[in-house]
Curated annotation (Swiss-Prot):
<comment type="similarity">
    <text>Belongs to the replication factor A protein 2 family.</text>
</comment>
<dbReference type="Pfam" id="PF08784">
    <property type="entry name" value="RPA_C"/>
</dbReference>
<dbReference type="GO" id="GO:0006298">
    <property type="term" value="P:mismatch repair"/>
</dbReference>
<feature type="modified residue" description="Phosphoserine; by PRKDC">
    <location>
        <position position="8"/>
    </location>
</feature>
<dbReference type="GO" id="GO:0005662">
    <property type="term" value="C:DNA replication factor A complex"/>
</dbReference>
<comment type="function">
    <text>As part of the heterotrimeric replication protein A complex (RPA/RP-A), binds and stabilizes single-stranded DNA intermediates that form during DNA replication or upon DNA stress. It prevents their reannealing and in parallel, recruits and activates different proteins and complexes involved in DNA metabolism. Thereby, it plays an essential role both in DNA replication and the cellular response to DNA damage. In the cellular response to DNA damage, the RPA complex controls DNA repair and DNA damage checkpoint activation.</text>
</comment>
<dbReference type="GO" id="GO:0003684">
    <property type="term" value="F:damaged DNA binding"/>
</dbReference>
<feature type="modified residue" description="Phosphoserine; by CDK1">
    <location>
        <position position="29"/>
    </location>
</feature>
<feature type="region of interest" description="Interaction with RAD52, TIPIN, UNG and XPA">
    <location>
        <begin position="187"/>
        <end position="270"/>
    </location>
</feature>
<keyword id="KW-0233">DNA recombination</keyword>
<dbReference type="GO" id="GO:0031625">
    <property type="term" value="F:ubiquitin protein ligase binding"/>
</dbReference>
<keyword id="KW-0007">Acetylation</keyword>
<comment type="subunit">
    <text>Component of the replication protein A complex (RPA/RP-A), a heterotrimeric complex composed of RPA1, RPA2 and RPA3. Interacts with PRPF19; the PRP19-CDC5L complex is recruited to the sites of DNA repair where it ubiquitinates the replication protein A complex (RPA). Interacts with SERTAD3. Interacts with TIPIN. Interacts with TIMELESS. Interacts with PPP4R2; the interaction is direct, DNA damage-dependent and mediates the recruitment of the PP4 catalytic subunit PPP4C. Interacts (hyperphosphorylated) with RAD51.</text>
</comment>
<dbReference type="GO" id="GO:0000785">
    <property type="term" value="C:chromatin"/>
</dbReference>
<keyword id="KW-0235">DNA replication</keyword>
<dbReference type="GO" id="GO:0006260">
    <property type="term" value="P:DNA replication"/>
</dbReference>
<feature type="region of interest" description="Disordered">
    <location>
        <begin position="21"/>
        <end position="41"/>
    </location>
</feature>
């Protein structure tokens, strides 16, 4: 499932297995009926999402929807805030900075000693593929794959995938029976709601600024986090980008310097 769906989706331009190749009738391959087409789409496609989108999804007749897009299997990208291992599962709290952290549960095989049963440590950026679930009105993911990011560009790529996938799916679901895309673009309007503000951090900061702020917040030392530590932990960012983020956060009152000009603490720290 992983290789034929999730990875092929990530490495393709929304084509091939797990992709979103558009045809006049909607999804790429012909289908005997609209119901079967939708069922096949839910079963086969893994839809990239933000946590904000997942938390706002509606559940009707055991089907999750974001706007007019049906979802079942999804991917998210975020940072692990907390990890707790039980005998049969691992529960992570994953934060993509679009909403509150989301619970992600990964079931483990007690007889299997492979890396699948290894707890990924907190403060690790990961890509998660799983099934959206709701229990007592609380949404969570049941993961079938959790993979640490090797390159932070994957974070940016995921955001672009979120926009594109929901745009394509919204258009497909908005098409009339004749197969021609409507002139007035409700799909684009929906996609704007999906891919516009929803993937931006809720606090109005950029992804880079949030990464710097979260590292400073997480530092337990009384003197705070020093600039060298920021550089060591944000190797994907240039020194000038880190400095710009620090200067912005300081000017906006999110952080302050402590023992010297190179140590910073969050104003939200307890």
């Amino acid at each position: 499932m992983w290789n034929s769906g999730f990875e092929s989706y990530g490495s393709s331009s929304y084509g091939g297995a797990g992709g979103y190749t558009q045809s006049p009738g909607g999804f790429g391959s012909p289908a005997p009926s609209q119901a079967e087409k939708k069922s096949r789409a839910r079963a086969q496609h893994i839809v990239p999402c933000t946590i904000s989108q997942l938390l706002s999804a509606t559940l009707v007749d055991e089907v999750f929807r974001i706007g007019n897009v049906e979802i079942s299997q999804v991917t998210i990208v975020g940072i692990i805030r907390h990890a707790e291992k039980a005998p049969t599962n691992i529960v992570y709290k994953i934060d993509d900075m679009t909403a509150a952290p989301m619970d992600v549960r990964q079931w483990v095989d007690t007889d299997d000693t492979s890396s699948e049963n290894t707890v990924v440590p907190p403060e690790t950026y990961v890509k998660v593929a799983g099934h959206l679930r709701s229990f007592q009105n609380k949404k969570s993911l049941v993961a079938f794959k959790i993979m640490p990011l090797e390159d932070m560009n994957e974070f940016t790529t995921h955001i672009l995938e979120v926009i594109n996938a929901h745009m394509v799916l919204s258009k497909a679901n908005s098409q009339p029976s004749a197969g021609r895309a409507p002139i007035s673009n409700p799909g684009m309007s929906e996609a704007g709601n999906f891919g516009g503000n929803s993937f931006m951090p809720a606090n109005g900061l950029t992804v880079a600024q949030n990464q710097v702020l979260n590292l400073i917040k997480a530092c337990p030392r009384p003197e705070g986090l020093n600039f060298q530590d920021l550089k060591n932990q944000l190797k994907h960012m240039s020194v000038s980008s880190i400095k710009q983020a620090v200067d912005f956060l300081s000017n906006e009152g999110h952080i302050y310097s402590t023992v010297d000009d190179d140590h910073f603490k969050s104003t939200d720290a307890e």
